[in-house]
């Protein structure tokens, strides 16, 4: 039996910081999600991660991808994992404490 969490993970990868900031802003405004953080992948790529209920993460990632595309050719990928396996949790950045 897989050990999974009930919290979804949304990821948007961009070319550059400006599209990443635009995507993060749109995602957090569009739905009840928590911004987990951003990762500088290298070569100018930035990945923004959000967590929340699956429906909210879906809406947030859609809004973030749309916003990122309005900035230019910044969107590289957008992906959602509905139920993250507990072992994957260990490699994710920790959410900032409120």
From Swiss-Prot:
PROSITE patterns: BMC_1, BMC_2. It is found in: Carboxysome. Disruption phenotype: Does not grow in ambient air, has a wild-type growth rate in 5% CO(2), called a high-CO(2) requiring phenotype, hcr. Fewer carboxysomes are present, RuBisCO is found to be soluble rather than in the carboxysome. Required for growth in ambient air. Expression of 10 genes for alpha-carboxysome (Cb) proteins (cbbL-cbbS-csoS2-csoS3-csoS4A-csoS4B-csoS1C-csoS1A-csoS1B-csoS1D) in E.coli generates compartments that resemble Cb, contain RuBisCO and have its catalytic activity, showing it is possible to make artificial, functional Cb using these 10 genes. Cargo proteins can be targeted to these organelles. Artificial Cb assembly in E.coli requires csoS2-csoS4A-csoS4B-csoS1C-csoS1A-csoS1B-csoS1D (but not the gene for carbonic anhydrase, csoS3). GO terms for biological process: carbon fixation. It comes from the Bacteria. One of its GO terms (cellular component) is carboxysome. The keyword RNA-binding does not apply. Residues 8-93 form the BMC domain. One of its GO terms (molecular function) is structural constituent of carboxysome shell. The keyword Cell cycle does not apply. Keywords: Bacterial microcompartment, Carbon dioxide fixation, Carboxysome. Belongs to the bacterial microcompartments protein family. CsoS1 subfamily. The tight homohexamer forms a pore with an opening of about 4 Angstroms in diameter which is positively charged. PANTHER family: BACTERIAL MICROCOMPARTMENT SHELL PROTEIN PDUJ, PROPANEDIOL UTILIZATION PROTEIN PDUA. Homohexamer with a small central pore; the concave side is mostly positive electrostatic potential, whereas the convex side is mostly negative electrostatic potential. Forms a CsoS2-CsoS1-RuBisCO complex. Interacts with the N-terminus (residues 1-136) of RuBisCO (CbbL). This is Major carboxysome shell protein CsoS1A. It comes from Halothiobacillus neapolitanus (strain ATCC 23641 / c2) (Thiobacillus neapolitanus). The lineage of its organism: Bacteria, Pseudomonadati, Pseudomonadota, Gammaproteobacteria, Chromatiales.
């Amino acid at each position: 039996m897989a050990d999974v969490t009930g919290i979804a993970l949304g990821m948007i990868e961009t070319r550059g910081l400006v599209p990443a900031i635009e995507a993060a802003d749109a995602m957090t405004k569009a739905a009840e999600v928590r911004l987990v953080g951003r990762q500088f992948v290298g070569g100018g790529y930035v990945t923004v991660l959000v967590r929340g209920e699956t429906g909210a993460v879906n809406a947030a990632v859609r809004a973030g991808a749309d916003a990122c595309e309005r900035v230019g050719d910044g969107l590289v990928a957008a992906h959602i994992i509905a139920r993250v396996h507990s072992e994957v949790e260990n490699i994710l950045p920790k959410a900032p404490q409120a």
